[in-house]
């Protein structure tokens, strides 16, 4: 899933709902290093064409699963931020699909065809599979052709996108039409 358009939508939603971009600097994440570690693990597992290495399949799978564990941990540690529980739920759906399908995210051939993709076997963290385990959690839909860097996506990706948009807009101080969490404790 390519997150840049989702971040842009989150910032636009924040502005439209009265938020300010400067408020994003006030957000304090717990264990942000886990987020950066997850990105590094993904880059090691699935290097771009400009990087001078190729990870062996077993190592790439272990690094990829490790990156998901780091990301889920970041979400759990920061669940107090509005919207992050939604994104974390999406990560858990994706992780469940990956773990029950041999360490790779299955993509339905029909979705790949609709996205203009064609590969057999394993490509980065995806594997073409017409009958995967947890079929509703796998990459089953294709982004429209007009979406930059369009690809296939899953129910987990949808939840991640919604959660990221809500988190960014809320962090900007937007007036969200969602119930605020009540403080607990004695007065």
Regions flagged by a language model, labelled:
Residues 12-22, 74-82, 166-175:
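Structural signal for the C-terminal ends of transmembrane alpha-helices
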Residues 67-101:
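Interfacial segments of alpha-helical transmembrane regions
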Residues 59-66, 150-162:
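Membrane-interface loop-to-helix entry segments
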Residues 1-67:
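Transmembrane alpha-helical insertion/packing segments
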Residues 53-56, 82-87, 104-114:
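A cytosolic-side transmembrane-helix exit/cap motif
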Residues 180-187:
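Short, charged juxtamembrane terminal tails flanking transmembrane helices
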Residues 107-152:
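Extracytosolic (periplasmic/ER-lumenal) interhelical loops and adjacent juxtamembrane/interface segments
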């Amino acid at each position: 899933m390519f997150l840049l358009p989702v971040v842009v939508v989150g910032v636009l939603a924040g502005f439209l709902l009265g938020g300010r971009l400067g408020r994003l600097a006030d957000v304090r994440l717990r264990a942000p290093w886990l987020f950066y570690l997850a990105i590094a693990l993904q880059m090691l597992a699935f290097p771009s064409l400009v990087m001078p290495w190729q990870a062996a399949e077993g190592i790439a799978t272990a690094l990829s699963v490790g990156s998901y564990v780091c990301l889920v941990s970041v979400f759990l540690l920061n669940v107090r931020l509005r919207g992050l529980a939604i994104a974390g739920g999406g990560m858990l759906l994706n992780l469940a699909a990956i773990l029950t399908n041999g360490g790779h995210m299955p993509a339905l051939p029909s979705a790949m065809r609709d996205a203009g993709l064609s590969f057999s076997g394993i490509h980065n963290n995806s594997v073409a599979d017409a009958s995967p385990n947890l079929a509703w959690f796998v990459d089953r839909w294709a982004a429209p052709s007009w979406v930059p860097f369009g690809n296939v996506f899953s129910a987990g990706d949808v939840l991640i996108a919604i959660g990221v948009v809500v988190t960014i807009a809320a962090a900007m101080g937007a007036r969200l039409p969602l119930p605020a969490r009540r403080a607990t404790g004695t007065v």
